[in-house]
Amino acid sequence: MQERIILFDLDGTLTDSGPGIMKASQFALRAYGVERDWQELDFFVGPPLDETFGQFMPKEDIPGAIDQFRVYYHDVGWLENEPYPGVREMLDTLQKNGFRLFVATSKLESMAVQVLGHFGLAPYFEAICGAPGDNTQAGKKVNVIRAALQKAGCTDLTQAMILGDRKHDIIGGKLAGIRTAGILYGYGSREELAQA
């Protein structure tokens, strides 16, 4: 029997979380003396935070910047977010047609659960897998994907795929050995997805 497992990225795929993430990034950068307009920080949406903050500061400052990001995001940023139009209907249709749905995000798992719960989307997913919050390799996309596949009990990788908007989703899916699909309404470009 086919398993038909679909893993979804969260930010830029299920919800438009850009404003909250970009403002939290601005808040964190400002704490380290870097001034940027929040609307210029769209490249923070999707990739792991250590990668994006690494473009602005030395490695030893990154954990502190991530902590600053989380202060803003936990207080305000997570609410500067909304599901993309049609997402609820898509999830409903997929679920009714026997697809098993999971989330695989680089966002903190606890925050992903909170966001999806707030918007009433959590019940569509068998599991919501995200970064553990300890800034380890466990939060890397391929590892989050593998965690979701493990929770799914997936025995046939050809029956699983990930849907996302950034190269990290596509690269992570390929490294995990599953099919990938890029969406163009999020924060990644066609070129970024094609080059992954």
Question: What spans do the regions from the language model cover?
Answer:
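N-terminal helical cap/lid subdomain that shapes the substrate entry/recognition surface
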Residues: 2-89
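Acidic, Mg2+-coordinating phosphoryl-transfer loop and its flanking beta/alpha structural elements
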Residues: 162-196
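Conserved H-loop
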Residues: 35, 121-126, 155
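Short beta->alpha linker loops
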Residues: 44, 82-86, 107, 165, ...
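Conserved Lys-Pro-Asp/Glu-containing loop-to-beta segment of HAD-superfamily phosphomonoesterases
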Residues: 4-5, 140-170
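A short, structured active-site edge motif that brings together acidic residues
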Residues: 40, 122-137
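Surface-exposed amphipathic alpha-helices with a cationic face
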Residues: 88-96, 149, 170-174
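Substrate-recognition element of Asp-dependent hydrolases with the DxDx(T/V) motif
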Residues: 90-116
